[in-house]
Swiss-Prot record:
Alphabetized InterPro entries for the sequence: Calcitonin/adrenomedullin, Calcitonin_peptide-like, IAPP
Keyword Secreted assigned: yes
Function noted in UniProt: Amylin/IAPP is a glucoregulatory peptide hormone that plays an important role in the regulation of energy homeostasis. Selectively inhibits insulin-stimulated glucose utilization and glycogen deposition in muscle, while not affecting adipocyte glucose metabolism. IAPP function is mediated by the CALCR-RAMPs (AMYRs) receptor complexes. Amylin can also bind CALCR receptor in the absence of RAMPs, although it is more selective for AMYRs.
Family recorded in the similarity comment: Belongs to the calcitonin family.
Gene from which the chain derives: IAPP
Official protein name in the record: Islet amyloid polypeptide
Record-level Gene Ontology MF annotations: hormone activity; receptor ligand activity
Pfam hit, one: Calc_CGRP_IAPP
Family matches, as SMART domains: CALCITONIN
Domain of life from the UniProt record: Eukaryota
Gene Ontology CC annotation, any one: extracellular space
Keywords: Amyloid, Hormone, Secreted
């Protein structure tokens, strides 16, 4: 669970830091 939480936080941080990275994780956001 701890590792999963860390991954979620890391993904969220990277997503906010780089829109391109977040777009790759969530292609739906690109459409909208």
């Amino acid at each position: 669970n701890t590792a999963t939480c860390s991954m979620h936080r890391l993904a969220d941080f990277l997503g906010r830091s780089s829109n391109n990275f977040g777009a790759i994780l969530s292609p739906t956001n690109v459409g909208s």
